Amino acid sequence: MALVTGIGYIGIGVSDLPAWEEFAETIGFQIRERGEDGTLYLRMDKAHHRVAVHPTGEDDLTYVGWQVADENGFDELERTLRAAGVPVEMAGEDDAELRGVARLMRFEDPSGIKSEAYYGLVSEPEVPYVSPYAVDFVTEDQGFGHIVVMVDDYDETMRFYREVLGLQTSDLVKVGAGGVQTRMAFMRCNPRQHSLAFWAGDSTTRLNHFMLQTQTLDQTGMTLDRCFHGGIPATNLGRHVNDYAVSFYITTPSGFMIEYGWGVREVVSDYPVDKYRSVSIWGHRNLDGIHYTQALPPEAAESPAEQHLVEEPVAAAV
């Protein structure tokens, strides 16, 4: 059983805050607040924020906020982390208030990705969530969305998230090019088909992409139109093999991607693990040379959906 119930929020560090402010509104975020240091707090629902954009200059993932159900779950997670030899920092009230939670702890995964766990996310139903483009996101018991990260050691990362945090494996993907095989794992802790995905590889940054899910297909399609009209680099629509998302990938002002889509399937606890050799049923073509994954080599098929036509399928983000 998972000790965490979803990713409640993430923090990203950026080098171009004004560009992010315009970009965030284009894809439907409500800017809830601006911190004293310039941090943008982006809203997707009744929570105060789900994404914090910090002007750190690093253009990468800064932290991941894992939600636990209550104080008992919070204490159990602390004990489990310490028993596994993971250093834990218990944050004070001021830090918890800054994150908008009741209690907060900090730790790192095996690759050094800064992680936080909390319970009691601040909810503001008295302050209506108003997207500038009337976008409604799927959140609640499924968390804010999913993240895909690059890690140092695949097996060590798998053990940590499965044995310590208690995530379940939803599916595995093994793809490659030029004789180099890449293993990708997709893990869940709630009905969302995956909250976390990762593969091992060399990269100057950790974050490949994070995913936002809309309530309707039209909301996804209209956001794609706004990106095209606004000159924001994006792929076309496609559908993934594992979570069935109809989605597209956007290049953010920081260079990493956002997957933006609809129709992610929900799974139950006894869902069997699947293995795939491709990432998309159709679509997700790169447009104007835009690559939506750090792992996509030049010899890739034009579309991930065409990977079954080549001898060795090509790694791509899901």
Curated annotation (Swiss-Prot):
Reactions mediated catalytically: catechol + O2 = (2Z,4E)-2-hydroxy-6-oxohexa-2,4-dienoate + H(+)
Cofactor: Fe(2+)
Matching PROSITE patterns: EXTRADIOL_DIOXYGENAS, VOC
InterPro entries associated with the record: DiOHbiphenyl_dOase (IPR017626), Glyas_Bleomycin-R_OHBP_Dase (IPR029068), Glyas_Fos-R_dOase_dom (IPR004360), GlyoxalaseI/FosfomycinResist (IPR050383), VOC (IPR037523), Xdiol_ring_cleave_dOase_1/2 (IPR000486)
Top-level EC class: oxidoreductase
Keyword annotations of the record: Aromatic hydrocarbons catabolism, Dioxygenase, Iron, Metal-binding, Oxidoreductase, Repeat
GO MF: catechol 2,3-dioxygenase activity; ferrous iron binding
Biological processes, Gene Ontology terms: xenobiotic catabolic process
Annotated residues for binding of Fe cation: H146, H209, E259
One Pfam family in the UniProt entry: Glyoxalase
Domain (VOC): residue spans on this chain: 6-120, 143-263
EC numbers for this chain: 1.13.11.2
PANTHER family recorded: GLYOXALASE DOMAIN-CONTAINING PROTEIN 5 (PTHR21366:SF14), GLYOXALASE FAMILY PROTEIN (PTHR21366)
Protein family according to the UniProt entry: Belongs to the extradiol ring-cleavage dioxygenase family.
Protein name, UniProt field: Metapyrocatechase
Native species: Rhodococcus rhodochrous
Gene that produces this protein: catA
